[in-house]
Amino acid sequence: MAVYTDVAAEELAEFLRGYDIGELLSYKGIAEGVENSNYLLHTSKGSFILTLYEKRVASEDLPYFLTLMSHLAERGIRCPQPEKNRGGAVFGTLMGRPAAIINFLEGVWPRRPNVAQCAAVGEGLARLHLAGQDFPLRRANPLSVGGWRALFEQSAAGADPLQHGLHALLHAELDYLEHAWPKQLPDGVIHADLFPDNAFFLGDTLSGIIDFPFACNDILAYDVAICLNAWCFEPDHSFNVTKARAFLGGYGRERPLTTSEEDALPLLARGAALRFLLTRLVDSLNVPAGALVRPKDPLEYARKLRFHQSVDSIRDYGVTASGVVA
């Protein structure tokens, strides 16, 4: 979450008159995150999240995200629900941006996830994948392997000034992944951005999964790889095999990986690392003046990419090919 677009009180009040969520008492921007503008609303009927969708979210994709959240919730996945306005629509326009209001979920996101939380998010991700199997809408992933070349071209000039040799690393890895990317793995609905700040906990219990604007249809194990990167490294960028074992074990208890998925996981983890390295690099070079946003460090994902380049098999992530402790 973040704030790129400042919302004037008068325009917000006019927008909220279209909803039955009570009288606005206060609102404030949420600085965490990097993609969309988010505000916490307090009204006479409770707390809500207002999201203005920014650069990487097209208004024509909003029915997919918002309908998906309702679909998942109906199947037991704890995720936000969009509020319909008085006309029955789940989104409108505010400050020239597509905007939606969702209900507020209780919980806090873990600043430093522990082993139990890694296991819980693995289970939660697998349940999300299973719950999405009968979702009728489809959306291609614009930030999968087919979209990385354009991101590289947008950011290439800024690579070596950030770190000597980064341009060569990106170029070589992109060439390799475009050639080697798997095409026959199980696919379906994925979250595609399940970082710790998009998972709420009450203690070690997963209380909610939020922030669905990158949800799409893609390789299920690619979503696993994204989480492996997001949840299983320490602040010093070292890989925590205990957390990885817990995460993969939690996932496998709900949806065991196929042999093909297990074999492909190191490659998918490289791809996931490259994806976030590229988007972070693009974002770091294009922060709007005055935006309430904290750009994420691209080099964090350069380190993760180099780690995954050294991985031979899923055993290096703490499990054997049969999904048990290595």
Swiss-Prot record:
GO biological process: threonine biosynthetic process
Enzyme class: transferase
InterPro entries xref list: Aminoglycoside_PTrfase, Homoserine_kinase_II, Kinase-like_dom_sf, Pseudomonas-type_ThrB
Domain of life: Bacteria
Known pathway: Amino-acid biosynthesis; L-threonine biosynthesis; L-threonine from L-aspartate: step 4/5
MF term (GO), any: ATP binding
Catalytic activity annotation: L-homoserine + ATP = O-phospho-L-homoserine + ADP + H(+)
Keywords: Amino-acid biosynthesis, ATP-binding, Kinase, Nucleotide-binding, Threonine biosynthesis, Transferase
EC code(s) of this entry: 2.7.1.39
HAMAP family: Homoser_kinase_2
Membership in a protein family: Belongs to the pseudomonas-type ThrB family.
Protein name stated in the entry: Homoserine kinase
